[in-house]
Regions:
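Beta-strand-turn-beta hairpins that frame and shape the catalytic cleft
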Residues: 1, 7-9, 98-103, 116-135, ...
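N-terminal, active-site-proximal structural segment of metallo-dependent hydrolase catalytic domains
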Residues: 1-72, 85-87, 240-246
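Active-site beta-strand/loop signature of hydrolases that rely on acidic residues for catalysis
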Residues: 1-4, 35-60, 122, 132-136, ...
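Short, solvent-exposed loop/turn segments at secondary-structure junctions
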Residues: 5-8, 55-56, 85-86, 100-103, ...
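Surface-exposed cleft-lining segments at the edges of enzyme active sites
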Residues: 20-27, 53-56, 106-110, 134-142
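Active site of divalent-metal-dependent phosphoester/diester hydrolases
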Residues: 57-62, 76-98, 115, 169-233
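Charged helix-capping and loop-helix junction motifs
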Residues: 62-66, 147-153
Length: 246
């Protein structure tokens, strides 16, 4: 599952971006309750990629939200990568919670005029028979996204079994998505899954992409509006030589 959780902030109307803007810098009592709901959902999955997760700052009550979700949902393994820090106020991150033990994690800064975007590459299994998972949150501008997806393509160029997930901030048939799929052999099993805004979805900017060796059994958007995005869920069948260990 891939989910942009907006630092645990629930948003149900556009006007709340203004009226609830203080929640992006200050703690609020509802945040942990919302995270508990997200943890309950996440507990149904084996691998979860998180975007806009806070790594422990003033606004989150100094709670590392990736760790919190992992513990609440019963995940054994977790990791966060902080891409942008605003003093003690916010530590914007991407995160992984997993039932399987990673064999290697590497953090990458993504190119772009404005810093603060990253990619987390996670390897599972044995060399030569491994699954590579990449969790990303891309820039708002198209030029930066094109650069960032070129970087992602180079990051996975030699890997046969790959899953890329995250908030790409672009649609299925956008030029930047066409570039990535053309460069890598990744595919999107189902196009135009609408995830944003969560209360009236009209844009498909959250994606899970796979290489042909990863067989997709099911993919859907889940109607769990605990953020301003909806989560994307996918069930996959891995090649027989790929073994994930807990």
């Amino acid at each position: 599952m891939s989910y942009n959780i907006q630092a645990g902030i629930s948003t149900t109307h556009f006007h709340q971006y203004l009226t609830h803007s203080w929640k992006h810098v200050l703690p609020d009592a509802e945040r942990l309750t919302n995270l508990d709901s997200i943890a309950c959902l996440a507990s149904n999955f084996d691998l979860v990629g998180l975007q806009e997760v806070d790594a422990g700052s003033l606004r989150s009550g100094f709670v590392n939200q990736t760790e919190y979700l992992a513990l609440k949902a019963g995940f054994t393994h977790w990791h966060h990568q902080t891409n942008r820090t605003i003093g003690n106020v916010a530590r914007q991150s991407i995160g992984l919670v997993s039932r399987f033990r990673p064999t290697l994690l590497t953090e990458h800064k993504l190119p772009g005029r404005i810093p603060g975007r990253g990619a987390l590459r996670v390897e599972f299994g044995s060399p030569g028979a491994q699954l590579v998972l990449v969790i990303i949150h891309l820039a708002l501008g198209r030029r930066a996204r094109l650069q960032q997806l070129k970087f992602i393509g180079e990051l996975i160029t030699d890997d046969p079994n790959v899953i890329v997930m995250g908030d790409l901030n672009c649609r299925s048939r956008s030029p930047e998505m066409d570039q990535l799929l053309g460069d890598t052999g990744l595919c999107e099993p189902t196009h135009d899954l609408l995830t944003f805004p969560s209360w009236r979805p009209s844009r498909n900017i959250d994606h899970i992409l796979v290489t042909p060796s990863v067989k997709v059994e099911r993919v859907s958007v889940l109607n769990y509006p605990f953020s301003d995005h909806l989560p994307v869920a996918m069930d996959v069948l891995l090649p027989g030589n790929v073994t994930l260990r807990s």
